[in-house]
Amino acid sequence: MRVILVIGRSNSGKLDFIKALTGSLPKGLDDEAFNNDHSGLIHKYNIRNKYFEASVGIWIEEYSNLAETLDAYSSEEAKEVIDSLGAIVYTFRSFDEAEWSLFKNFIDKLQLEIPVIGLHMSDEKLLEPPDVFTPEYISISEEGVNEFNEKVGLDRVREILDCCEWNLSQVDKSFSEEKDDAGDFYLPERFKGSPDMQSTDLDNLMKEMNQIRDADLEKNEKKAKALNLLEKLLGDEFEENDYESL
């Protein structure tokens, strides 16, 4: 099972985030070994949604020099560690453009395909958040949805984590209905003969599926959008394992 890496400076809100996400704090906080540095603490996050249930591990990393820490994670010796990560949450109280750039370069260097969240642990959000796809800037102070009806704040973090591939045995599986890298989506055979599935529905579905395929999104987000689209169109006919036949 892959894990979540929560990384940040001392007093950057790592434990506040974990408490908000899971409802509890890691064991061992009273241990003298963790008095001045929370690196090495572990916890669990239980995911339950309509598609699966999983108990996902959380690793906590604390740094004083981010460049050195990311260099260590970029080394060949750390490849197994990187491969075991399903998501990274970088916590901070005050935005540091230099640190943000370090994370962006780290993601590009390793060609990471997992979600990387820049979580602003402050009561106020940035007026002009970084205009980059990843790390994704999220302000913990926001609630509900934005003007585009998209989840924000902690709900957005949960949404991202719900879409991750947590099972290591499935990491190398290609998402979607693509038969190859350049192919189109294909609908599961059992829907093609459905009396409720009209040709216009099929055409629209395939059009939207191909738009999802071509979108500049990570594989796990494409999968989530495809599943939501199928469920919306097919209603009671939709089965959770339909994406396995895509």
UniProtKB/Swiss-Prot annotation:
One of its GO terms (molecular function) is protein-macromolecule adaptor activity. The modification Phosphoserine is found at residue 194. The keyword Phosphoprotein applies. The lineage of its organism: Eukaryota, Fungi, Dikarya, Ascomycota, Taphrinomycotina. The keyword Phosphoprotein applies. One of its GO terms (cellular component) is nucleus. It comes from Schizosaccharomyces pombe (strain 972 / ATCC 24843) (Fission yeast). Keywords: Phosphoprotein. GO terms for biological process: clathrin-dependent endocytosis; vesicle-mediated transport. InterPro entries: Irc6. This is Uncharacterized protein C19A8.11c.
